[in-house]
């Protein structure tokens, strides 16, 4: 919850987006709705969620994202490791992954690094990690300025991985302060972060949900991490097409040069309303199909159903590969989630995919299971 900016203390803010009151779409089977509104601090220009459920609700026992459930992400992990290896001698490095989830990256990087530590508050995921792997440890907690003292993490790491985590933390400024302290001198931070300026410019409002707590941008991160220099900028060559990938290195240099242009997020409420209308039109145009189901019971799907009554009328089933989601429902609806292996695909003539970046993975999987109908991507 934001009443004043936790960075500069200013109370003046500009409305960026207001989704109204919607369910927690990153969770399943929830009926309660909460306001989802983003405002930009007029002084430091960082955009925050104005009101949000607390982290213990968002990432407690009902949270259901497991990184190992995506074969595409498992394959992508090798690209992360290769990128890190081009910038530092990994086998001599102590590595920290913040937001390690169930250890998909940790398992692969452990054999290539000196030591590996993962930290994540999601206990159901961290408990699945095999801690018998040599030189590897898991901390089940939030990463912040208190945690780095409690677990003795200050100046312990040559490499810190922050992969699509930063826009989900409760206090982004405290997080960045703690982040700057755990890195050794000349150590690096590997970032992948959703660039919400690009998201808004492309009218991809399905990227918003409870749990996206701030819309901090790469150029703002670069300025806030004072003793760090950008040594590699890979643009949007990342797992998600809207995620910016770059590496910052801790340095003692005083003459800091900035890599990223000084840009900021502007109000997009009118575009959001047009997007809502476009979602309704998209599903109205599916009237020629006999049986339409969704694919991917994720936050994107939940947001679409939260803002579109037409989508909820058209789709009653969403398929997913995650067994933990089986037979549950999309929050705020009666839409049921079915495991793809337990559903008769021959009865379907159209599937709507809610996550476009895994299209090839899903298309291949469906064809291998004998699906011959249409696969559409929800992109307006």
Enumerate the predicted regions with their spans.
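A conserved beta-strand element that flanks and buttresses the S-adenosyl-L-methionine
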Residues: 161
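Conserved class I S-adenosyl-L-methionine
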Residues: 92-101, 292-295
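Short, glycine-/aromatic-enriched active-site segment of Class I SAM-dependent methyltransferases
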Residues: 21, 191-214, 218-222
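A short glycine-rich, Lys/Arg-flanked "PGG" loop and its adjoining helix->strand segment in the class I
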Residues: 173-188
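Hydrophobic, well-ordered beta-alpha structural blocks that scaffold small-molecule cofactor pockets
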Residues: 84, 245-380
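Conserved SAM-binding strand-loop segment of SAM-dependent methyltransferases
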Residues: 133-148
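N-terminal juxtadomain amphipathic helix
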Residues: 1-72, 236
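Conserved beta-strand signature within the Rossmann-like core of class I S-adenosyl-L-methionine
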Residues: 186-194, 375-376
